[in-house]
């Protein structure tokens, strides 16, 4: 596995091959804004079978803007959000790109929930820009 990431304190670590990443996205939904404390979450879609997690995650469940139950996994010790998934889609993990040891290779494919994006959250995209998926919903499949 050629990529790794971790929580702030290092109690939770994860590993995957970047070739196994399905896609990457900026999500501007209110739930992601609240859990990140900023204007968006940058997430990588990875099949659950392609990621290995060492350490114990604690999960908080809430109804997401998509209408699905989102299970948000975070470190019990430092509180860093590491990954999440929709309870209705357990075979797909959403890894927080900011927890990667090296995120320089990440290329964002699309943007979700732009209708709830804040004007103060500048969009610093390089060409080509990620495509905006409808502005109000997350795609139903990866």
Regions found by a protein language model. Name each.
Residues 125-142:
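Single conserved hydrophobic/aromatic residue that forms the stacking wall/gate
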Residues 1-127:
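A short Gly-Trp-Pro
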């Amino acid at each position: 596995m050629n990529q790794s990431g971790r929580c702030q304190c290092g109690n939770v670590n994860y590993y995957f091959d970047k070739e196994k990443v399905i896609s990457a996205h900026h999500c501007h939904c209110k739930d992601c804004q609240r859990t990140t404390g900023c204007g968006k979450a940058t997430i990588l879609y990875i099949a659950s079978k392609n990621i290995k997690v060492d350490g114990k995650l604690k999960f908080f469940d809430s109804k997401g803007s998509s209408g699905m139950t989102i299970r948000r996994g975070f470190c019990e010790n430092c509180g860093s959000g590491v990954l999440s998934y929709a309870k209705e889609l357990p075979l797909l993990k959403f890894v927080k790109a900011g927890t990667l040891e090296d995120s320089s290779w990440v290329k964002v494919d699309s943007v979700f929930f732009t209708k709830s994006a804040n004007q103060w959250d500048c969009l610093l995209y390089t060409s080509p820009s990620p495509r905006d998926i409808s502005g109000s919903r997350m795609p139903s499949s990866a």
